[in-house]
Curated annotation (Swiss-Prot):
Catalyzes the conversion of 3-deoxy-D-arabino-heptulosonate 7-phosphate (DAHP) to dehydroquinate (DHQ). Its main location: cytoplasm. Belongs to the sugar phosphate cyclases superfamily. Dehydroquinate synthase family. Its EC number is 4.2.3.4. GO terms for molecular function: 3-dehydroquinate synthase activity; metal ion binding; nucleotide binding. Binds 1 divalent metal cation per subunit. Can use either Co(2+) or Zn(2+). GO terms for biological process: amino acid biosynthetic process; aromatic amino acid family biosynthetic process; chorismate biosynthetic process. Pathway: Metabolic intermediate biosynthesis; chorismate biosynthesis; chorismate from D-erythrose 4-phosphate and phosphoenolpyruvate: step 2/7. The keyword Oxidoreductase does not apply. GO terms for cellular component: cytoplasm. NAD(+) binds at residues 71-76, 105-109, 129-130, 142, 151, 169-172. This is 3-dehydroquinate synthase.
């Protein structure tokens, strides 16, 4: 069992990583006997894990209600969020309740925002079931729902009480979702840890076949890196922005193509190549390093070009609505070397458009 602590003073919390955690009531600390829980999951995961998690919580004496949401990025919306509030109010659940997010990034982000908002804030626990949510979205307290005009535009910073990563969940993950998660894994190597990127080049095949020790190390290293960044910059005023490599381009793809048509990791993968091409055009990143990124993403089964039907010009309106925009200027996360990156403002729209075009004609 691996345990990592996100250090945020009184709001510090553990990330527990192991197989078989759904069999152990102690995995879901700080829940105690007699407490009330609303378990939030989706229609795909409910048949797989709902009864198991409900059972282990009830074994610990916890009173469990549940709400099952539709599955898909297109349902990460205010309308679906309202169904969680309705379920909480109908029981009713008070300010002493705990929300448990059993699912991937959509369930986790939406449940976290529900917890931040319900009665001005209740406790919640993240139980991520996808690789993407285990290495990224469940850690750090970013919660949100989407708006038709932009991804994650309505949300809050709100930290969980704990994160429970059961590696066994990956056994039921579709290959496309596994690849989507690997995009965020590769991101950590590009922005923060060149040695980890080297390790990924050597061990990607083991990850694709869900090798236990390799996957445990991979998830642990990603969580360590994210925990360090969040502890240093919880509300994304500086360092934490680096975690958005590829996301300014990627969110544009998701919004333009319709949420759910491109998985988040797929859009981020293409966006990371666009960021690398932008950095190349600025003369601060080599084509050889871009090729290393492209090769690793391709091996993972991820796209390295944007949608053919989406023009370069179509990216700009979405990018100008990005949450990182300051004083009307797009701020981009750009690699400087494998393992090193920067936040860059003032890049001309023409250069950005040319970099996007590079990734459409490649």
């Amino acid at each position: 069992m691996e345990r990592i602590v996100v250090t945020l003073g009184e709001r510090s919390y553990p990330i527990t990583i192991a197989s078989g955690l759904f069999n152990e009531p102690a995995s879901f600390l700080p829940l105690k006997s007699g407490e009330q829980v609303m378990l939030v999951t989706n229609e795909t995961l409910a048949p797989l894990y709902l009864d198991k998690v409900r059972g282990v919580l009830e074994q610990a004496g916890v009173n469990v209600d549940s709400v099952i949401l539709p599955d898909g990025e297109q349902y990460k919306s205010l309308a679906v969020l309202d169904t969680v509030f309705t379920a909480l109010l109908q029981k009713p659940h008070g300010r002493d309740t705990t929300l448990v997010a059993l699912g991937g990034g959509v369930v986790g982000d939406l449940t976290g925002f529900a917890a931040a908002s319900y009665q001005r804030g209740v406790r919640f626990i993240q139980v991520p079931t996808t690789l993407l949510s285990q290495v990224d979205s469940s850690v750090g307290g970013k919660t949100a729902v989407n708006h038709p005009l932009g991804k994650n535009m309505i949300g809050a910073f709100y930290q969980p009480a704990s994160v429970v990563v059961d590696l066994d969940c990956l056994k039921t993950l579709p290959p496309r979702e596994l690849a989507s998660g690997l995009a965020e894994v590769i991101k950590y190597g590009i922005i923060l840890d060149g040695a980890f990127f080297n390790w990924l080049e050597e061990n990607l095949d083991a990850l694709l076949r869900l090798d236990g020790p390799a996957m445990a190390y991979c998830i642990r290293r990603c969580c360590e890196l994210k925990a360090e960044v969040v502890a240093a910059d919880e509300r994304e005023t500086g360092l934490r922005a680096l975690l958005n490599l590829g996301h300014t381009f990627g969110h544009a793809i998701e919004a333009e193509m319709g949420y759910g048509n491109w998985l988040h990791g797929e859009a981020v993968a293409a966006g990371m190549v666009m960021a690398a091409r932008t950095s190349e055009r600025l003369g601060q990143f080599s084509s050889a390093e871009t090729q290393r990124i492209i090769t690793l993403l391709t091996r993972a089964g991820l796209p390295v070009n944007g949608p053919r039907e989406m023009s370069a010009q179509a990216y700009l309106p979405h990018m100008l609505r990005d949450k990182k925009v300051l004083a009307g200027e797009i701020r981009l996360i750009l690699p400087l070397a494998i393992g090193k990156s920067e936040v860059r403002s003032g890049v001309s729209h023409e250069l950005v458009l040319n970099a996007i075009a590079d990734c459409q004609s490649a």
